[in-house]
Amino acid sequence: MSIALSRLPGDFLDYYLGQGYYRMGQNLFTCQFLPLDTGLYTTHWLRLAVARATYGPKQRRLFRLNERFTVATRPFQLTPEYEVLYARYYQSIDFDANPSLGDLLLEGGTHNVFDTHILEVRDGERLIAAGVFDSGTNSIAGIVNFYDPDYHKHSLGKYLMLLKLEHARRYELDYYYPGYLVHNYPKFDYKLWACPAATEVFYARTHQWRPFSWDEVNREAARLFAERAAHDLEEEAE
């Protein structure tokens, strides 16, 4: 299911993020299943309660590792510099993604319905990483992180997650939404990395957010598959 918009008020984005929706191009969408080559998987939307977020040794170590880099936050405008960096990133990844940043965010157009910002990470003058996020009134949604593969030892994707969380903390926002994880598909588990203890997971049936735990996700995945199987049986009987 998706929603098309012309301009998005901040409180509108807050509401729909809280209902398990997310940005795709210039629309909002939600889903409970993800079909992949290896099978059908359940999706589980996440958010971090900013006020409860704390860092452990791994997160603090990453801040120290990258402290020589400069960081700036700007309103998003698509530039050749961003596209060049995204192209380098795109060539280095082993999963499906949009071939350009403009295609991913603007779907080939120029109008943006979202209040979008970008975090830049530079080594001197060189842009080495960038993280795009949308702002609501009380929350942000992380849309994409991309980085120079030459700096892979600096874990810049995870670093950008921490920087987005710190941006939300600086502006006293309630939530940072990093997207969904996929049950039994560890490639998405990095979204828990910033602070599992502050992470909540969405339950579409009750429209509730609960503290994250793998036990809860396992039960929710089993329930979703059971409901899907029952629905398929009903359709076959008709």
Features from the language model and the residues they span:
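Acyl-donor binding region in acyl/amide transferases
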Residues: 1-18, 103-106, 113-116, 127-199
